[in-house]
């Protein structure tokens, strides 16, 4: 108890999605909201499957955004490696690296766990580099060991948002 009334909004960063936060905060976590690329409260079928897989495999209550981003990274690399024309010989290391980079740049519309489709491109512009611009606003509805969250909003910004 820090003496902060329940009527005061409490905002956290994406790290607030990590399990120790609601476990340590207990009932004080209720009403805290934050943004992250993934919410375990997401109702999409892929999210429900991911949540169940991580519960079974790792014995955790709910996966956080770090779990989801690692999963998406591995899946995107899998797509790129399948599509890259690789030699895999000792003398082809530089060419293979370029082929992998180019294959990643050609991934478009990957529908993973992130809050929106992920696309890459070869252009070195902020619009291309910064990729998905969908933020998810998440709130704790229950704290403690068996914490619960809800998705409060999703906001997708235009590729040029904040660049003017």
Predicted regions and their residues:
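Short, low-complexity, Pro/Ser/Thr/Gly-rich segments in the mature regions of secreted, periplasmic
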Residues: 153-164
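Extracytoplasmic/secreted envelope proteins and their assembly/folding machinery
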Residues: 18, 47-51, 74, 78, ...
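Segments of small-molecule ligand-sensing domains
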Residues: 56-64, 78-150, 163
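Extracellular/periplasmic bilobed ligand-binding domains
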Residues: 1-40
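Short, surface-exposed amphipathic charged segments that create phosphate/polyanion-binding patches used
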Residues: 26-27, 48-52, 134
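C-terminal substrate-binding/catalytic core of Rossmann-like NAD(P)-dependent dehydrogenases/reductases
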Residues: 43-59
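A short beta-strand-to-alpha-helix junction
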Residues: 42, 63-73
């Amino acid at each position: 108890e820090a003496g902060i009334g329940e009527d005061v909004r409490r905002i956290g960063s994406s790290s607030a999605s990590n399990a120790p936060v609601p476990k340590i905060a207990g009932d004080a976590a209720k009403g805290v909201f934050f943004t992250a690329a993934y919410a375990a409260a997401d109702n999409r079928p892929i999210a429900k499957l991911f949540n169940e897989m991580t519960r079974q495999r790792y014995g955790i209550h709910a996966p956080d955004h770090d779990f989801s981003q690692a999963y998406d990274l591995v899946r995107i690399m899998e797509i790129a490696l399948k599509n890259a024309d690789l030699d895999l010989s000792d003398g082809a290391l530089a060419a293979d690296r370029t082929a992998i980079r180019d294959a990643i740049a050609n991934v478009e519309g990957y529908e993973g766990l992130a809050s929106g489709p992920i696309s890459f491109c070869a252009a070195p512009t902020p619009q291309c580099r910064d990729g998905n611009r969908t933020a998810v606003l998440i709130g704790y509805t229950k704290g403690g060991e068996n914490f619960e969250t809800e998705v409060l909003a999703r906001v997708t910004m235009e590729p040029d948002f904040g660049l003017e």
